């Protein structure tokens, strides 16, 4: 997949994986638009990266997604690459009841339904360029769940299954469908998890871009590849190893 002169839209682009991908695509010659719920956070990024474009959008809102779609049409004459990265990560135990059902449903709405909505509304626009791509960010935890984050892992497993399906459905089009499956990455989202190794953002971005340019549709940086393999060959062992300190 080429990156030069491509127009890239990244959800959840104000921090973490979304932001490092934005920087990576900028360095690769792409025009980058990041969106997120927190406009103040996006404006801070804009101050640092003047070439980046920002747009406020909550991916759980159909109306805000439609408005973002119109903005991409009018201001950028479409997009070439959609990266569904927006997500939240909640650690909780059902026995203590500290996370409300509303918070659990919100995690599903952002992590899973948000990506579905973005593809639903943006697909016609992505069918226009000669070459386009959808990148869904799931997780190595799609293969082996971390029991401390049950809803997060369930949403990422669903993203993995859904991505395989839409890749198959779109194989006769000009849209390439990628899935980035990171291991735990050193971001503020998972700072509550102690004692578990985390991948550095720049290392993740380097691996992603190398595989993206070579059309490797399932990208498993670092330990994520091991999780995927061991989930097939030794599922009980790797599940216990991952969760032994939880």
Named regions from a protein language model:
Residues 12-16:
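Conserved glycine-rich cofactor-binding loop
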Residues 28-43:
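Conserved glycine-rich Rossmann-like NAD(P)H-binding loop of the short-chain dehydrogenase/reductase
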Residues 57-67:
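The beta1-alpha1 cofactor-binding region of Rossmann-like NAD(H)/NADP(H)-dependent oxidoreductases
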Residues 66, 89-105, 148:
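Conserved mid-core segment of classical short-chain dehydrogenase/reductases
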Residues 119, 155:
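Active-site helix of classical SDR
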Residues 139:
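Residue(s) in the substrate-gating loop at a strand-loop-helix junction
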Residues 179, 187, 191-232:
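C-terminal helical subdomain
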